[in-house]
Curated annotation (Swiss-Prot):
Organism in which the protein naturally occurs: Manduca sexta
Protein's UniProt name: Bumetanide-sensitive sodium-(potassium)-chloride cotransporter
Glycosylated residues, chain numbering: N396, N404, N419, N816
Pfam families reported in the protein's UniProt record: AA_permease, SLC12
Superkingdom in the source lineage: Eukaryota
Family from the record: Belongs to the SLC12A transporter family.
Claim: Transport is one of the keywords in the record: yes
Membrane-topology descriptor: Multi-pass membrane protein
């Protein structure tokens, strides 16, 4: 197929073609919607719903939009804009209820946080990329330092310097073009490219460095303009002050201010100025080439070193001649550092990408062409300067050998180099090009045009880069400077900031001091651009489809390494400073964690790494040395049982998997599920809990828990421990609920999961605080009031829901109720800690500190300080105490491992482990204790004491037995539900075990009543041998009136080993 006709669609021939649509032979007309559907779409029920209408005796067909809810593929459906069209959601097409709200994923996908400023002048590739790149490349070095580079490095190494610079720039341009053509590029230039490719940390860091480099480059070019202007004035006997440096500062400040005003006026004025400046520069370069070909016009020019093109001069100047110059012993890399800023204009088009009509096409085309032309021009000027001028010249005509008015020997004019008294020549004068030109004043105009045009381009790009950073809210300090003004959205505040930054470096008034500084900054930026392309091409996310094909992944990597190597070779100290600045800015953004999602390649790499790691982990055999408890926490919504989630986090913190299971008996719409997911994830992040939430809906507790147990996780990343709360209402709940709870334990054991049950005083369930209105992004409100009128916290408009999505920082005064932990009253009295006050505080007047503060929810539930403290029981710092472990039965070691993990956390570091174990033979007590101590030593578990329990078989006290009988009385009656009835036969059969549990209660009360946490082996509920109420009665007796209790039963595979 001919490529030219590749995208042309031929018309369909035939008589059955109407209105450009090929019609079949048979047309069936039928109603396309029911009356209900018509009403939903705003069509009257009695309106005609046929596919054809008769009007004025002719047929017309209804449009497709009237026949279907479906949306056709349109560009507007994919735009990241609030004004973009929105295709029908899946819920609308499927017929779900509650579909009026856009999916959160789609809202995040739309770039609402990075709005583009008001639309201004849009430029094509010539005006927007080609000319700005040429002007930026043809900068201060073109007329003021290129001849000096030739004098130091010689023609040969000068061409090498140009070649290395060209290679770096070409590779970077190819990399930049690949990124720019992988979708639409908005305003922000280099920052936008890198941030959307590698993420906000890299993009913002390089963006700040690049903006700073451009601001300093503007001052550097302004200094070049001032130097040239002052040389012209002084050559004519004019001066502003006695000090040339002050002249540079005065003229530079005025010039900088005028250029900022020109840029702030708008793109159209700046574009008109560029066209004028580019014409002057090209004319000055032609003037230099013509003058060099013509040769010296008089003997004074020969005496000043301009001898005309000759092979002898070319050969003499071909080799290098590095000397002490500019307060430094020059070498190849120091000269390279001075020259490199003259080729750093390749980003000029990308910097104003938001002002381009078609950035994806304009940036590659304009940049590469500008780079080609500028490198050719630099090469020609090096060849002409090196082939037509001497390195040293005295300027004295008397040093010339003149015969019959013709100079026959000019070698003597260079003898001044022996005593360093030469004032002219490539080494000593920056005005060589003016000397070699056909008309000298034109070179001054070209120099001014080159310097001012580059400064204009830099000054134009910096405010827009700052604006992009501010709009994205990466660095809060830049938000103030990003405000757009006028119909073109000009960042006037950014121009003011740019002016003062450039002015600060303008006051240095030394071009050669500034050039190496910005060379490192530009090289760092180019290195990141190349790394962006390499990383994206390496990861190859599905979204990586650049239309620019002339790039190579390994070439981009080579460009990255080359930039870093050149940075270190040019000035290693400044390179380290640049790296330090970059990583500081990187860490600031990383610490702030901006809420952005730009689909960067680091995210794609994260996904690929996680996937490959999960596959590799699945192929790796399990080993006891690598065991970690991976928890499935049946907490419902995490806000409802914060203490249970905190305990799970205490065990799995930053080391293993934790999944919070949420079971809902109602069938929830997608909208409600999404709102719950957002609310739960935000709550977990706010509480600094690393966990995943897994939700099932439309199931009762037992089948929902079974689904979570069997379906949670992937590969080896699957739960191996089920953590759940103790059912404190087991004596009053419906029989089905009690049986379901008990059956979940059997389900866990059937799937070979370990089980852990936690009980705390007052219970774990605070779901009454969390209302069911999660789809509105809010839960039951929690407010604090005081019994004293003076210390009131509740105010109108400050009722905050427990899991509200509202940003509390936007309310005044600031009450952080999002995690239900912290509340500060008007007297700065913090309730979150709930610690005991010392004696001095207790002695204060009751009116001062002993007010009773009560927390009220929307449902009227009151929470005391004690209840609030219980909600944060496993989160707050524990005072000195003990962590008692009753390791009664060998379950593989999990019962001893979990408390050891807890004791290693900083919040529980003050709690010492006390181990309680059962003795098998009373007459061998000492031997049993020695064996247990030896086992613990081999496991390398530190403990403060070891107690062997020897009277476990003693009968319980009568009052203990009476308490047990009272507990199970309801379930032994004839009227009890058959599923929850404890028969006399069961009591008799399990009498020995029951007495053992009752005896354990007495031992626990005697030894562990003051412990911070008690961890105990969970009795094994043998399937078919024990009923749910009797088993719960065992747990009730062993945990009532005791500190927080954690029952643990491992899956009887070893989780500890004493082998290395």
């Amino acid at each position: 197929m001919n490529d030219e006709n590749r995208f042309n669609v031929s018309a369909v021939e035939g008589e059955s073609k109407k209105n450009g649509i090929h019609m079949g032979a048979n047309i069936i007309t039928r109603p396309l919607r029911s009356s209900v559907e018509n009403v939903e779409r705003g069509v009257a029920p009695n309106s005609q719903s046929e596919g054809w209408h008769h009007e004025s005796g002719w047929k017309r067909r209804r449009s497709l939009a009237q026949l279907t809810r479906e949306a056709l593929p349109r560009m507007e459906n994919y735009r990241n804009s609030k004004r973009a069209l929105k295709r029908p959601s899946l819920g609308e097409l499927h017929g779900d209820h509650l579909i009026t709200e856009e999916d959160e994923k789609d809202q995040n996908h739309r770039d609402t946080k990075s709005p583009t400023p008001a639309v201004g002048i849009k430029l094509g590739w010539i005006q927007g990329v080609f000319i700005p790149c040429l002007l930026n490349i043809w900068g201060v070095m073109l007329f003021l330092r290129l001849s000096w580079v030739v004098s130091q490095a010689g023609i040969g190494l000068s061409l090498v310097i140009i070649a290395i610079s060209a290679i770096v720039c070409v590779i970077t341009t190819l990399s930049m073009s690949a990124i720019c053509t992988n979708g639409e590029v908005k305003g922000g230039g280099i920052y936008y490219i890198i941030s959307r490719s590698l993420g906000p940390e890299f993009g913002a860091s390089v963006g700040i460095i690049f903006a700073f480099a451009n601001a300093v480059a503007a001052s550097m070019n302004t200094i070049g303009f001032c130097d040239s202007l002052n040389d012209l004035l002084r050559s004519n006997g004019l001066k502003i002050t006695e000090d040339p440096i002050n002249d540079v500062r005065i003229v530079g400040t005025v010039a900088l201010l005028v250029m900022c005003i020109i840029c702030a006026i708008g793109m159209d004025w700046e574009s008109k100025a560029q066209n004028f400046l580019i014409a002057i520069i090209v004319g000055a370069m032609v003037d230099f080439v013509v003058g060099t070909i013509m040769g010296p016009k008089d003997n004074s020019e020969i005496a000043k070193g301009f001898v005309g093109l000759s092979s002898a001069t070319f050969v003499e100047n071909f080799k290098s001649d590095f000397r002490f110059s500019e307060k430094l012993d020059q070498n190849f890399f120091s000269v390279f550092a001075i020259f490199f800023p003259s080729v750093t204009g390749i980003q000029a088009g990308a910097n104003i990408s938001g002002d381009l009509k078609d950035p994806a096409s304009a940036i590659p085309k304009g940049t590469l062409l500008a780079l080609l032309i500028s490198m050719v021009s630099y090469t020609l000027m090096v060849l002409f300067a090196g082939g037509g001028a001497l390195r040293d010249a005295s300027g004295n005509i008397t040093d010339l050998l003149i015969v019959n008015g013709t100079v026959t020997d000019y070698s003597s004019v260079s003898l001044c180099a022996l005593n360093n008294t030469c004032e002219y020549g490539l080494h000593n004068s920056y005005s060589v090009m003016q000397l070699m030109s056909a008309w000298g004043p034109f070179i001054y105009g070209g120099c001014w045009a080159a310097t001012l045009s580059t400064a204009l381009t830099n000054l134009l790009s910096v405010p827009r880069l700052i604006q992009a950073l501010g709009v994205d809210r990466i660095y809060p300090g830049l938000i103030f400077f990003s405000k757009p003004y006028g119909r073109h959205g000009e960042p006037y505040r950014g121009y003011v900031l740019t002016f003062f930054v450039s002015l600060l470096f303008l006051l240095i008034a030394d071009l050669n001091t500034i050039a190496p500084l910005i060379s490192n900054f530009y090289l760092a930026s180019y290195a990141l651009i190349n790394f962006c392309t390499f990383h994206r091409a390496l990861v190859r996310p599905l979204g990586w489809r650049p239309t620019f094909r002339y790039y190579n992944m390994w070439l981009s990597l080579a460009g990255f390494l080359m930039c870093v190597a050149i940075m270190l070779l040019v000035h290693w100290v400044m390179s380290l400073v640049t790296f330090a600045i970059f990583f500081t800015l990187y860490l600031i953004v990383h610490y702030r964690r901006p809420d952005v999602n730009w689909g960067s390649s680091t995210q794609a790499q994260m996904y690929k790494t996680a996937l490959s790691s999960a596959h590799a982990l699945a192929r790796t055999g399990e080993h006891v040395k690598n065991y970690w408890p991976q928890l499935l926490v049946l907490a419902g919504r995490p806000q409802a049982r914060p203490a249970l989630v905190d305990l799970g986090n205490l065990i799995s913190k930053a080391g293993s998997l934790m999944i919070v299971g949420d079971i809902s008996q109602e069938k929830l719409s997608y909208k409600v599920r999404s709102a719950r997911a957002r609310s739960d994830d935000e709550w977990l992040r706010g509480r600094k809990v690393r966990a995943f939430c897994s939700r099932v809906h439309g199931f009762s507790f037992e089948p929902g828990a079974r689904a979570l147990v069997q379906g949670s996780g992937v590969g080896r990343l699957a739960p191996n421990v089920l953590l759940m709360g103790y059912k404190s209402d087991w004596t009053t709940c419906p029989a089905n609920d009690l049986v379901s709870y008990f059956n979940v334990l059997h389900t866990a054991f059937e799937n070979r999961l370990a089980v852990a049950i936690v009980r705390v005083s007052g219970g774990l369930d605070y779901s009454a605080v969390v209302s069911e209105g999660a789809e509105e992004g809010a839960a039951g409100s929690l407010t604090a009031t005081s019994s004293s009128g003076e210390l009131r916290v509740r105010r109108d408009g400050l009722i905050m829901h427990a899991d509200s999505d509202l940003d509390i920082r936007d309310t005044q005064p600031k009450h952080n109720l999002s995690n239900l932990l912290t509340l500060t009253t008007s007297r700065s009295f913090t309730i979150s800690e709930c610690k005991e006050k010392d004696k001095k505080k207790k002695e204060r007047k009751p009116n001062d500190m002993h007010r009773q503060i009560v927390y009220n929810t929307a449902s009227g539930l009151e929470l005391s300080k004690f209840q609030l403290a219980q909600m944060s029981l496993f989160q707050k710092k524990q005072e000195s105490g003990t962590l008692d472990v009753w390791w009664l039965y060998d379950d593989g070691g999990l019962t001893i491992l979990l408390p050891y993990i807890i004791s290693q956390r900083s919040a529980w570091a003050n709690c010492k482990l006390r181990i309680f174990a059962l003795a098998n033979r009373l007459h061998e007590m000492e031997l049993e204790e020695r064996n247990m101590a030896n086992l613990l030593a081999k496991f390398r578990i530190d403990y403060s004491s070891l107690t062997m329990v020897q009277d476990i078989t003693d009968p319980p006290q009568p009052e203990t037995k009476a308490l047990f009988d009272e507990t199970i009385k309801k379930f032994t009656e004839e009227s009890a539900s058959p599923d929850c009835r404890i028969s006399d036969m069961e009591l008799q059969t399990l009498a020995v075990k029951t007495n053992r549990q009752l005896r354990l209660r007495e031992l626990l009360l005697a030894n562990s009543k003051d412990a911070r946490l008690v961890v105990m082996s969970l009795p094994m509920p043998r399937k078919g041998s024990i009923s749910a109420p009797l088993y719960m009665a065992w747990l009730e007796m062993m945990s009532r009136d005791l500190p927080p209790m954690l029952f643990v039963r491992g899956n009887h595979t070893s989780v500890l080993t004493f082998y290395s």
